[in-house]
Amino acid sequence: MKKELILKALKLRDMGFPSGDIAEELNISVKTALYLTLNGEELLKAGETPKEDSEKLDIFLEWDNVRASSRRLRNISKIICDMLSDVEFDGIVGISSGGVPLATLISDELDKNFSIYVPKKHVHTEKEKTTGFIGQNMSSIVGKDVIIVDDVMTSGNSVKETIKYLKGIANPKKVFVVMDKSGIDEIDGVKIEHLFRTGVVDIKK
């Protein structure tokens, strides 16, 4: 288990993040997030994950070297633009926060309307929040055909929430993610497209 991942999970836990939000932030499953928040200190002391728990571990995706560079992000956005060549749409919605930089670059490249969806996990309020909201240029996508962009899809919860919200004001046609860990091809009738997808191969000795 990577020490940096454990430390990030513990830091988010101490900041008050629930396991579901930690999972989304670190691109890991909810079970893995819960495991790290409950056992992180012991794992750090031990220096490695106990063998009996190894089958419970999840795949951790890190692409900081890409998203830290606007030039590299633009190259990724051009690949997505190429994948969009046969899709007719009016606007792009980036899911906050990871999908926003890519959605911005894609909208600039294709000269499309741009908007942001802020999931409920990023809405900090004393009252329980049941949904997120459109954070920018809502009027530009109302009644329009739109695509949704995010960086990593882990459980699919944020994408599902975004699709549900947008169906009330627009027509979501497709979802594009850079990396997919969920294995989900479609949510509520909306197709999921990915650049990369992870999977687990069970090799028995």
From Swiss-Prot:
GO molecular function list: DNA binding; orotate phosphoribosyltransferase activity
GO biological process: pyrimidine nucleobase biosynthetic process; regulation of gene expression; UMP biosynthetic process
The entry's keywords: DNA-binding, Transcription, Transcription regulation
Keyword Nucleotide-binding in record: no
Record-linked InterPro entries: GfcR-like, PRibTrfase_dom, PRTase-like
UniProt keyword annotation of Transcription regulation present: yes
Family: Belongs to the purine/pyrimidine phosphoribosyltransferase family. GfcR subfamily.
UniProt remark on domains: Contains an N-terminal DNA-binding winged helix-turn-helix domain and a C-terminal regulatory domain (or effector binding domain) resembling phosphoribosyltransferase (PRT) domain.
HAMAP family xref list: GfcR
PANTHER family, per the entry: OROTATE PHOSPHORIBOSYLTRANSFERASE, PYRE-LIKE PROTEIN
Protein name: Transcriptional regulator GfcR
